[in-house]
Amino acid sequence: MKRSARWTALSLVTMLLLSGCGSFLGASNENYVSDEEAAAGGSTTTLPVTTTPPSPTTAPPPPPATGGQPALAAVTPADLASPQALEQRLADLHFDVTVDGKMDDSTKQALIAFQKLNGLPRTGQPTPDVTNALATAKAPDALKPDGGATRVEIDLGRQVLFLYTNGSLAKILPVSTGTGKRYCDEGKCGIATTPRGSFRIERRITGWRTSDLGRLYNPMYFKGGIAIHGFPSVPTSPASHGCVRIPMSSAKTFPSQVPDGTPVFVV
């Protein structure tokens, strides 16, 4: 009887191991081409017993919540008046921006990402609402804190991407994902959906790749033909056939920080 129970338990463990994570359910996207295809010993001495009342102690207050990142130095909106100070504040908050004092596309895209995270109008301009929010902003909380030291998190609701390296937030990018609508292009029809779930970077192409549905720059594929890639147009709302568009200003260096096998969480 004991032997039978032991074999039954062993069989159950084996079944659980064989049916665990690591496979995708449902139809494969391998043949689908998008537009973006396109974490001391010693002696003892007896001493007289004395009673001393315990000293009162006060527990230190908890540190402010910063999403697991170091707290930023306090600034005022007036401190962010110059383009370079504005860019430096965005960079300190891990938005992907070039700190050069130029209000270029890199700065605009970083501002859009900040506006998306904070529920502000997505203008890409340093309006008073933006500088007021930047002055007191903190790093966001992780979506998947146990997802691995190096990982990509994609927030479909807010249309932003987070890159973590060595357990710390490294970059925040604005993205544009699948519209969720039906499309037909040159006889190919489908639903423009960016799949939710847990994936990994499977393969990549360096430089431009031209597909039936458009062009992709430095695509990194994580689900069949669905990729993270650079594109000249990254609207502030979903606009792709399913891929995750990132700004060209980020797409040049982003792949070097995301090796093949990196976990990708789409939520």
Language model region names:
Residues Q88-F95, I112-L120, A135-A139, N166, ...:
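Sec-exported extracytoplasmic/periplasmic mature domains
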Residues C21, G26-N31, P53-T58, D141-A149, ...:
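Exported/periplasmic cell-wall-interacting domains
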Residues P62-P77, P128-R151:
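Intrinsically disordered, low-complexity Ser/Thr-rich linker and spacer segments
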Residues P140-G180:
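A structural motif detector for short, solvent-exposed N-terminal "entry" segments of globular domains
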Residues P83-E87, K108, I112, T131, ...:
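Extracytoplasmic/secreted envelope proteins and their assembly/folding machinery
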Residues M1-L25:
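Secretory targeting and sorting signals
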Residues A74-P83, Q88-Q109, A113-A133:
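Short acidic, glycine/serine/threonine-rich helix-capping segments at coil-helix boundaries
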Residues G42-T66:
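Extracellular mucin-like PTS domains
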